[in-house]
């Protein structure tokens, strides 16, 4: 499934990104995280940098952005990219998002599993991710899928105090 254009499930498809998707990813992260957590434009700017870096450095052999949709409606997304800061053969899971209307049907789990399968298929040794302690649903899924919390650190990247978390899964 890692290299295919679209992977079908019972109620949604996972497809590779197309032109225009990065703008949608930035928009939905900005709007949704503002509504649910009160996060500001600094978060939206961070997401914009991640998506711009994805486009600038995209290596289709080792990286993917999957879009989940149903009947053309955006339901969620996730990225798997090379961990360019690492000296080992690691990947990073980035920008997992599931729309409120698509929660509770296994979409988040499907997106994470798609990353894991692809990472194994292309030979990564581990997947790392960074999240925040306030994102309980995502943290629950990461734990269920085999990720281990390896480090926490308080930060103010968004202009207020949060606890960042580094998670990792060995493949």
Language-model-detected regions and their locations in the chain:
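Conserved N-terminal entry element of GNAT/NAT acetyltransferase domains
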Residues: 1-23
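Residue-level signal for beta-strand positions within conserved beta-sheet cores that form or flank
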Residues: 10, 76, 89, 125, ...
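Generic serine detector
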Residues: 10-11, 86, 101, 125, ...
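Acetyl-CoA-dependent GNAT
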Residues: 16-101, 109-114, 118, 122, ...
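C-terminal "cap" of GNAT-fold acetyltransferases
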Residues: 125-171
């Amino acid at each position: 499934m890692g290299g295919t254009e679209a992977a079908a499930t019972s109620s949604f498809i996972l497809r590779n990104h197309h032109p225009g998707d990065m703008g949608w990813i930035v928009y939905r992260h900005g709007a949704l995280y503002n509504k649910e957590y009160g996060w500001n434009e600094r978060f939206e700017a961070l997401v914009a940098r991640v998506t711009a870096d994805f486009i600038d450095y995209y290596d289709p052999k080792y990286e993917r952005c999957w879009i989940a949709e149903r009947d053309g409606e955006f339901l969620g997304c996730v990225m798997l990219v090379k961990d360019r800061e690492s000296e080992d053969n690691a990947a990073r899971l980035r920008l997992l998002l599931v729309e409120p209307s698509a929660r509770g049907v296994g979409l988040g789990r499907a997106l994470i599993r798609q990353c894991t399968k692809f990472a194994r298929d292309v030979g990564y040794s581990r997947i790392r991710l960074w999240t925040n302690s306030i994102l309980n649903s995502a943290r629950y899924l990461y734990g269920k899928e085999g990720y281990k919390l390896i480090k926490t650190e308080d930060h103010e990247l968004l202009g207020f105090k949060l606890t960042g978390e580094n998670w990792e899964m060995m493949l």
